[in-house]
């Protein structure tokens, strides 16, 4: 990422991420399509509303791996190979421990959280079953995300693509097998997801043990180096905290949707599944910009950073808005693929037509956050997103719904807070001194070493 044509480097790095996320989104949609078609709208509500709860519990740990990727990318760009080796093995060890913790926490807390979310009684038993099975296999999800961060930090987005394709195809086949033929219900959908996630984690691990560079995982070197873990956590914890608090805010939003009944849950759950396609350019360019920024700032190529970030921002915003326009036009047909109930379709289409045209500002926020994280300034995106997407969003919805009991009030909470965060990120991008952050970090580290 530090050499060659900027536009082609970013595009070629982002493209495999885009395609990989596309396949991942297909298998997320496949879960809901199979469940909605063969098990009915209550089961669809149980599965489709899963995103906010999963993000609440998984988002924190996976956010830490964003920090790991920044640290590895920084040392890789600076050619400090020994530190790259230490960071890779510390990340792997931490992934194993945190994945086991997440499994225990998820299985224990699922019933409590679902009840706090006002999950309707006709949906609750199936929701508990689905989530407990999902979190029983959380270790596979965490390990895959850790390995994915290592691949991306070394500038490799192709291999994660291959493994996602394999995982996605496996998930779709098992979904149909377990739900349609074995009659395992929502438990079959959860089991298919767990198996496919472990498969991608295992393949990624095997590949990283065979690569011939400083990112190679040597199993007997997998241990936590505490100074390195502190550095990873210092960079990644803000993103982890941000993910968890945003997840908590979305759980609160979901509980407001749940108050409108199982039709609203199913319709909005279906919308959230198709909304994932709008995140394809958002995620791919955000990750590409984080890696591009961390490597080039590590190599002190500041002009290259300016040109690359401008290209990434324009590309991510334009593609997200194009997808949003398609959603507005075809909303009823897209929601109707999951369940043909007129009430379910009405709720999902209403949400799509309220939010989709604002995907441009959502993409702008995420891409700018990716750039700033790549510079190691992870506290800034955390604070902006916590204030805008959590505090303001929850306060707006809680207060407004009390006076106007209309579900569209809940829907508007998203675009309003996306616009606020975009204003904040734009101001910091042009006014904040984020580009020279690594130099300050190196100066502090050298000063501390000299004192010792």
Annotate each language-model stretch with its function:
Residues 41-52, 131, 190, 262-277, ...:
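Small-residue hotspots at the loop-to-helix junctions and early N-terminal turns
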Residues 3, 7-26, 30, 53-60, ...:
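Residue-level signal for short hydrophobic patches within transmembrane helices
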Residues 1-14, 72-139, 181-237, 293-358, ...:
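Short alpha-helical transmembrane segments in multi-pass integral membrane proteins
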Residues 12-31, 133, 144, 167, ...:
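Transmembrane helical elements of multi-pass membrane transporters/channels
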Residues 26-45, 114-121, 177-184, 244-271, ...:
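Helix-terminus/linker motif at the lipid-water interface of multi-pass membrane proteins
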Residues 65, 133-152, 160-168, 189-202, ...:
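Short runs within selected transmembrane alpha-helices of multi-pass transporters and secretion channels
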Residues 44-104, 141-160, 254, 267-331, ...:
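Small-residue-rich hydrophobic transmembrane alpha-helices
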Residues 56-59, 171-176, 201-205, 277-280, ...:
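Hydrophobic transmembrane alpha-helices of multi-pass small-molecule transporters
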């Amino acid at each position: 990422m530090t050499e060659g044509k900027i536009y082609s480097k970013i595009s070629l790095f982002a493209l495999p991420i885009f395609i990989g996320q596309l396949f991942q989104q297909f298998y997320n949609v496949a879960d809901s399509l199979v469940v909605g078609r063969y098990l009915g709208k209550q089961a669809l509500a149980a599965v489709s509303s899963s995103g906010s709860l999963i993000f609440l519990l998984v988002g924190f740990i996976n956010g830490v791996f964003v920090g790991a990727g920044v640290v590895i990318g920084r040392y890789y760009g600076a050619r400090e190979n020994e530190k790259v080796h230490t960071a890779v093995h510390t990340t792997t060890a931490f992934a194993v421990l945190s994945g086991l913790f997440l499994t225990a926490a998820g299985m224990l807390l699922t019933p409590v959280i679902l009840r706090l979310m006002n999950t309707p009684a006709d949906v609750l038993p199936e929701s508990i079953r689905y989530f407990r099975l999902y979190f029983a296999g959380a270790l596979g999800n965490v390990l895959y995300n850790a390995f994915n961060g290592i691949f991306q930090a070394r500038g490799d987005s192709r291999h994660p693509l291959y493994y996602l394709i394999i995982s996605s195809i496996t998930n779709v086949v098992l979904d149909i097998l377990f739900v349609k033929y074995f009659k395992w219900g929502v438990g079959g959908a959860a089991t298919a997801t767990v198996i496919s996630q472990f498969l991608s984690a295992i393949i990624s691990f095997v590949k990283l043990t065979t690569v011939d560079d400083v990112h190679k995982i040597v199993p007997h070197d997998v241990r936590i180096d505490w100074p390195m873990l502190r550095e990873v956590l210092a960079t990644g914890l803000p993103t982890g905290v941000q993910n968890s608090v945003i997840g908590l805010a979305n759980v609160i939003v979901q509980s407001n949707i749940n108050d409108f009944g199982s039709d609203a849950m199913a319709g909005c759950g279906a919308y959230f599944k198709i909304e994932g396609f709008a995140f394809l350019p958002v995620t791919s360019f955000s990750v590409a910009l984080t890696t591009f920024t961390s490597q080039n700032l590590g190599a002190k190529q500041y002009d290259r950073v300016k040109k690359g970030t401008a290209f990434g921002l324009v590309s991510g915003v334009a593609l997200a808005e194009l997808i949003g326009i398609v959603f507005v036009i075809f909303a009823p047909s897209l929601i109707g693929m999951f369940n043909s109930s007129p009430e379910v379709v009405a709720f999902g289409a209403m949400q799509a037509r309220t939010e989709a045209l604002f995907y441009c500002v959502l993409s702008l926020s995420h891409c700018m956050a990716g750039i700033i994280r790549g510079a190691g300034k992870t506290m800034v995106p955390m604070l902006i997103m916590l204030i805008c997407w959590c505090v303001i969003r929850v306060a707006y919805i809680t207060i407004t719904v009390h006076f106007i009991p209309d579900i569209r009030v809940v829907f508007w909470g998203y675009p309003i807070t996306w616009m606020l965060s975009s204003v904040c990120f734009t101001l910091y991008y042009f006014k904040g001194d984020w580009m020279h952050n690594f130099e300050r970090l190196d100066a502090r580290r050298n000063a501390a070493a000299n004192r010792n």
